[in-house]
Amino acid sequence: MEKQFLKQRSDFEKSCVEREKKYHFPQGVIFETDIAYAKDKNKAHRLDRYRPKGKEAQILPVIINVHGGGLLLGNKEFNKYFCALLSKKGFLVYSMEYRLIPDCTFFDQLRDIFLAMDFVKEHAAADGGDLSHVYLVGDSGGACLATYANAIQNSKKIAKAAGVKPSGLKVHALGLISGMFYTTKFDKIGLFLPESHAVIDMLT
């Protein structure tokens, strides 16, 4: 099963190369890529930053984007055009990479979310971001992670049960697209989710 998932991941990465040829990056966006949000040199601990041109002097609301892919595949590049369009609407956007199952656990992925959030908390003001308006956006598996991360942020009980230290960054709203919310192990993705865990029990 693990080999099958790794093959799907490899096929996805190849499809992204072809996809890149079909789309043109929107004009009017300042784009910086592969910024490390942790000091461990893990290639998964990187993010991209998007800011609209012509608004360098303005303080902008902040979006942190968490890509989808069923927790097993995907990358920040897949949401490149989506994030650029969000930026053109007047947002400072950070699009983060995170470790993928089965190379890590679901709770490791949440730790990555909080590492990226701490990075944003530390750097957003210098990047022209408004920390009083921070939004967490995710699709599919990214929406699932964003939901659990937000629950942990707002409940010491859930954070303790998860064994995950939340970020000090306050999130003011979630933007969830086609969220993946599995609570059983009756599908191939669910095989890698905890069969029974206090955090899941609290939220289901």
Regions found by a protein language model. Give the residues of each.
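Alpha/beta-hydrolase superfamily serine-hydrolase fold, recognizing
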Residues: 1-204
